[in-house]
Every structure is written in structure tokens, then in C-alpha cells.
Amino acid sequence: MAYNKFKIEDLQSKLSLPVEKEDWLNKNLSPFANDKLLMQVLIEAKKAYLGSEKARSEFIVTPVLQALYRQNKGKFTIFSGYEFNIDKSKALNGFCDFILSSPTSGFIIESPAFFIVETKKNDIDDNAIAQCGAEMYAAQIFNERKGKPQKAIYGCVTSAYSWGFIKLENSIITIDPNYASLSFDNPYPPLAALQWILNKSLAN
């Protein structure tokens, strides 16, 4: 078993993490600055076949995260397709789609704070949420071992067009029921949420 095999019920039964739905994202998010490069990339993405998870990752999700990075250079590092093995006895092992970690000069994760899981389908499903929750719990263990505990670990599950946000705080997984929508003409709602969460993570 690995992160991507977790079910929602496993978070409670195997990791003792209750799962709740509650509004926790700020509803008055600051607008994300216009990113001309992202808009150019999305214009080209319109012409591509986007029927697979890999295509959506390459043409939409990755460019969105790169835009976030451009606005916050030096504040975090993006790890993509990273093998994050923490505790195989609890199935806390496997590859993560994206990890946002504290900045590092090398290629080793220092203090992971944010996980992004891409759905296999065109919408957000419970399996992707469970995978994200397990990865967040693993990050909590990792940070505690490193002597860098964080008040909260954050996560996001995305189909590329819909972005759902999750947090792990006080041993509770909380899913915000309000998803952020991305369109080719307006990719900024999820970026505004990502920026707000990044600011919260940096303040941890």
C-alpha cells in the first residue's frame, strides 16, 4: 500500500485523523498579480489534447505553480514526482505529484508544508483527497523528526480546472467545500488561494 491507495475511511481508521468539511479559506483573498507568461502558456494549452492527467499536469497545473513561484522567488521550492517515504508500516510511502517545501539550495526536502495531488479524473474525488491527507500526515511526521514542527500542513487536490483545499491541524483533516475554478481566460482564483495558503505556511 502507498499514498495513492488510501481511502477516506483509512484516514480515520489507520491514521486516527477525523475528516471534516468546513469553510476555512479566507473569502476575501487578495487578487493575484497578472502573469503574462502564464496567460501565454494557457493560450497554447487550449490547442493541446488535455484528456489525460499527464497532459493537464504539463499544460495547466505545472504552469500555475510556476506562476506562483515567480511571484515568490526564494520563498519555497517545488518538488515534482518526489518519492516521499516516511513510514512503510503505515503505508506512508510513494511518489507525490507536487510538494512545496521551505527553500533549499540542494535537492533534499527541508520542511514540506504543502502537497498538491492531481486527480485521475476530470473532477475532484475522495480518493485524491485521501491520498493528499495521507501525504500531509507524513509531512507532519517528517517535520517533527527534523525538529521543525508546523502548526498546520496544507494540501490541494486538483483536476486542473477545479482546485480543492485541505488542511491538517490539531490532528484533524479539514476540507474547504468551496472549490476554486480555473479557466483559460482566468486562472487566478486558485492562485489567489494558493498565495494565501503560502503566506500562512510561511508564518507557521
Predicted regions and their residues:
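A short, conserved, highly charged catalytic patch centered on acidic carboxylates
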Residues: 2-4, 11-23, 27-151, 167-204
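Short, conserved secondary-structure transition motifs
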Residues: 157-164
